[in-house]
Amino acid sequence: MSTSTFNRRWAGVILEALSRHGVRHLCIAPGSRSTPLTLAAAQHPAFTPHTHFDERGLGHLALGLAKASGEPVAVIVTSGTAVANLYPAVIEAGLTGEKLVVITADRPPELIDCGANQAIRQHSIFGSHPAATLDLPRPTPSIPAAWLISAIDETMGALAAGALHINTPFAEPLYGELDETDLTWQQAPGEWWQTTTPWLRYEKIQAVSAQADWPFWREQRGVVLAGRLTAQEGEAVAQWAARLGWPLIGDVLSQTGQPLPCADLWLAHPRAAALLAQAPVVVQFGGSLTGKRVLQWQSECRPQEYWVVDPLPGRLDPAHHRGRRIVADISAWLEQHPAHPMMPWDEPLEGLAAQTQRIVARELTEWGEAQVAHRLPELLPPDGQLFLGNSLTVRLVDALAQLPAGYPVYGNRGASGIDGLVSTAAGVQRATGKPTLAVLGDLSTLYDLNALALLRDAPAPFVLIVVNNNGGQIFSMLPTPAREREKFYCMPQNVCFAPAAAMFSLNYDAPESLAALKEAVTRAWRSSVATVIELRVPETAGAQVFSRLLKAVCA
């Protein structure tokens, strides 16, 4: 049997084993060393292939697919720096829990550290960021297929969240006709090929046990803090908190409907902390909190009990409260801890939030990114989804908008980087097929500009709003040195995105008022071609308006 044929069979077994663990989407970059994997993937009926020429964007595309589907997603790349380009996506998956299966083709061992072309040290290249790493040997018939299958089953069976890095070397030749004369190695697993289940099945028993003293605590005053949740979890948490009569502080990614809107503003009011301090227990669901004032309150509050409930491992509490870290499925935990109907105790907080919302509506009458953030719910497509970028964009929406409960909202708030955001949004849409609104800043869009190529194949209307405030204006909200701020922090690029949209044959619009923006978005929802909408806004106006609102709320 030729080397190229056995490489293909080895790769085919890897992918077949992964398909038994729910992998449906494969993201593939061009490359020669990965040929056995690519050809095996192309011929496998269980996979939906996605391609992209930029491995960094490809990793984020896979991240978005995993984020929205809730399934493991595989990535195939060739050897060399192609592997290193996946690093940001691997880091984000490790922090937010998406299951990424990163399959990296490698040179065989004798070509490492000897000057061979495109050969780097890929062993443990991602350091501690993957949840698991599997370094496979050079394909050889002397290693039974059952070993290879069970190695995949073991790592996938134990993978609760995060990335799995599978490094697999392939020797040349990589090309050639598939030799069908000797199938002994491939056929050794027997009837496994006719089934759809793993060779080695790992049983996970994840029963959620109730907190023994919950009947006591549910009778007390409490506060619910909601971070990043799914739409289903967000609605359930909101209903649970309302039934308990506990105030709910919801992050922009909580999908709870934020019943106390504009929390990142009203928490700056002197009365807020004192009112919340009346609660002896705080229950936090999910991590990745966005708002500065929310994080400050979370850090400074000192309840008798602080509980963090999330399926991901780790503390998820940068303030290091004394309390309980409950690793559990949130929906299952809520079922085990039913709410006892209580009268709300947070009327003063409701009044504070309502007053803040009135101030926001009164102040935000002029065109700009703050007004767009406040009125963003009016732009959402029915039965669609929202993807928010990082930096100033997500903070303004978090503080100024009240998003509908249960409306899907996505973002990369693990490492909160501005890389790969267009790619991630494209992956989110490919997983769901829903109309998608993405809102990013100009630097974030520039950072991932070639990912506009991914929007050419959008399965539903896609609107990318680029808030062009000419640089990283988040630094205008920070105490950066005034003299160095523009050159070394904000870094204005003075660009227009119309040529970029034209390059990738996308629609383009540049409205200059809220009414014109609504008209542009309405047109875009009727188009089968993705639309880039550029909002050219005053550079520092967003930061200045936010500062003014904080002062007005605290007055």
From Swiss-Prot:
Annotated metabolic or biological route of this protein: Quinol/quinone metabolism; 1,4-dihydroxy-2-naphthoate biosynthesis; 1,4-dihydroxy-2-naphthoate from chorismate: step 2/7; Quinol/quinone metabolism; menaquinone biosynthesis
Cofactor note: Binds 1 thiamine pyrophosphate per subunit.
Cofactor(s) required, per the database record: Mg(2+); Mn(2+); thiamine diphosphate
An example molecular function term from Gene Ontology annotations: magnesium ion binding
Coiled coil regions in record: none
EC number: 2.2.1.9
Catalytic activity line of the entry: isochorismate + 2-oxoglutarate + H(+) = 5-enolpyruvoyl-6-hydroxy-2-succinyl-cyclohex-3-ene-1-carboxylate + CO2
Keyword Translocase part of the UniProt annotation: no
Cited SUPFAM superfamilies: DHS-like NAD/FAD-binding domain, Thiamin diphosphate-binding fold (THDP-binding)
BP terms from Gene Ontology: menaquinone biosynthetic process
CDD domains: TPP_PYR_MenD, TPP_SHCHC_synthase
Keywords, ordered alphabetically: Magnesium, Manganese, Menaquinone biosynthesis, Metal-binding, Thiamine pyrophosphate, Transferase
InterPro entries: DHS-like_NAD/FAD-binding_dom, MenaQ_synth_MenD, MenD_middle, THDP-binding, Thiamin_PyroP_enz_TPP-bd_dom, TPP_enzyme_TPP-bd
Pfam short name (any one): TPP_enzyme_C
PANTHER family attached to this UniProt entry: 2-SUCCINYL-5-ENOLPYRUVYL-6-HYDROXY-3-CYCLOHEXENE-1-CARBOXYLATE SYNTHASE, PROTEIN PHYLLO, CHLOROPLASTIC
HAMAP family assigned: MenD
Quaternary state and interactors: Homodimer.
Family: Belongs to the TPP enzyme family. MenD subfamily.
Function of the molecule: Catalyzes the thiamine diphosphate-dependent decarboxylation of 2-oxoglutarate and the subsequent addition of the resulting succinic semialdehyde-thiamine pyrophosphate anion to isochorismate to yield 2-succinyl-5-enolpyruvyl-6-hydroxy-3-cyclohexene-1-carboxylate (SEPHCHC).
Protein name, per record: 2-succinyl-5-enolpyruvyl-6-hydroxy-3-cyclohexene-1-carboxylate synthase
Species per Swiss-Prot/TrEMBL record: Cronobacter sakazakii (strain ATCC BAA-894)
Top-level taxonomy: Bacteria, Pseudomonadati, Pseudomonadota, Gammaproteobacteria, Enterobacterales
